[in-house]
Amino acid sequence: MASEQLSRRENITTERKIQNAEDSVPQRTTHFELRETHELGPNFQSLPRNENQAYLDRGARAPLSANVSESYLDRARVPLNANIPEHRVREKEDFGGVRDMGKFQMESKGGNKSLAEDRETLDTRSRMVTGTPHIKEASGKGQVVEERERARERAMEEEEKRLTMEEISKYRNQAQQSALEALSAAQEKYERAKQATNETLRNTTQAAQEKGEAAQAKDATFEKTQQGYEMTGDTVSNSARTASEKAAQAKNTTLGKTQQGYEATRDTVSNAARTAAEYATPAAEKARCVAVQAKDVTLETGKTAAEKAKCAAEIAAKVAVDLKEKATVAGWTASHYATQLTVDGTRAAANAVEGAVGYVAPKASELAAKSVETVKGLAASAGETAKEFTARKKEESWREYEAKRASQLQEGEEILPSTGGIGKVLPSGERTQAQGTNLQEKVQGKGSDILGAVTETVSDIGSSMIKPIDNANTKVKEHGGTTITPKGQDAGGVLDAIGETIAEIAHTTKVIVVGEDDEVEKSMQKNIGSDSHSLDRAKHEGYRAPKNNVS
């Protein structure tokens, strides 16, 4: 700490000295500049502008010489106005008057006597002032040189000041660093010395304690030995007395435990017997209940199996009946579809004939012939479409029936329902025969219905063909025209084609629905025969030609 205070005091003293020196130098420079400006200012202002500028330029370009190194005070004492031409002429003219010599006024006395002396003095002074060119240049460029010197001195002063401040800061930092290092070293040294002292003190204390403990251990050993001898004697006597007491207590305890064990064993046996009896009675009851429940379950299971078999048989019978009905419905649908197409074709032919009647007479025969061909084509197309549709529906119905039959029937036997409520097992042969008989009976019944419907359709077709032609003839007669009657084969060609088509449709429907059967075949032929007779009768009645074609 003392070293830091000393270094701070030295730094403060040095800084004060430097500041005083820096303050004194500018003051002196400013004093000389003011004096020179006051003395040389009027002379420079009296010069013409061109000469003054040329003089300053020449002084700025001229190199420094040895005479420039003289002081500012010596240059200030030289009267510069003596070099001006106007002043020289005025001095030559007025030798006897008062003249300015520098800063003093001089008065010449004696007139011509002193003329030579005055002129000689003036020449000498002129030579001194205007003697050599470098004096004039030095006197003219004094201000420029002064400014340069002043700037140079200022720069040097600033540089010295900057260097001085940097050195001061550097020395200060070094001193602080050295002080910190010395302080750290002293602190470390103190810590090491303190640690060594503490360790030595601890070792000494530990050694003293060990010596004291050894002495105490020796005394304690002696005391313990004495106490052990005394305690051994007391312990032996106490042990003998305690052993006798423990033996007496053990005897009493053994007797008590034996009595308690006997009583506990007797109670346990009686409780176990009573618990076994109590447990056996509910167990027997539970076993009896379980047996009864098992018996009931067995009976219920048998009854349930019989009922399930009965239900399965009923379901199978219902499915078979449904399939048969579906097959019959498919036959009905095909017959209805074929009949509808035939009726539509017949109506179209009748409409064509009716339109042809209303046309002019020369075209009547041609239109009738074309209508016959058109009706034949429509009838044939209707019959072919009905056959394909009926065949496809038959195959689909048969496949569905076979699939459901295979899924519902068991292998080799089937349970059929009976009036007694118990299922009856039938062999597969008898089952098939019975099903075939029932199927044949139902199909025959349905086939008769289908053929009856076909017969009615044939009658409707005949009526539909006759009515349009009668209406056409009636309209022609009302208008006073000529009725047209088909000739030869054309007269019955339309009705023949329709009759043949209907017969084929009926036969195909019968084969698809009920199969080949003699009784059904006879019934169908009978119905078709009656239909043919009725159709022929209608044809002859409707197309009976009048005696006179032209009315």
From Swiss-Prot:
Gene Ontology annotations for the cellular component aspect, listed alphabetically: cytosol
Coiled-coil residue spans: 141-211
Residue(s) carrying N6-biotinyllysine: K103
Superkingdom of origin: Eukaryota
Keyword line: Biotin, Coiled coil, Germination
UniProt keyword Coiled coil present: yes
Residue spans of biased composition, Polar residues class: 223-242, 250-265
Region (Disordered): 1-29, 197-265, 518-551
GO BP terms, alphabetized: cold acclimation
Compositional bias per record (Low complexity), positions renumbered to this chain: 206-219
Induction entry: Induced by abscisic acid.
Tissues where this protein is expressed: Expressed in dry mature seeds.
Residue spans of biased composition, Basic and acidic residues class: 1-20, 533-544
Protein family membership: Belongs to the seed biotin-containing protein SBP65 family.
Role, per record: May serve as a biotin source for several growth-limiting enzymes that are necessary during seed development and the subsequent germination stages, and thus may play some roles in determining seed germination capacity.
Protein name: Seed biotin-containing protein SBP65
Species of provenance: Pisum sativum
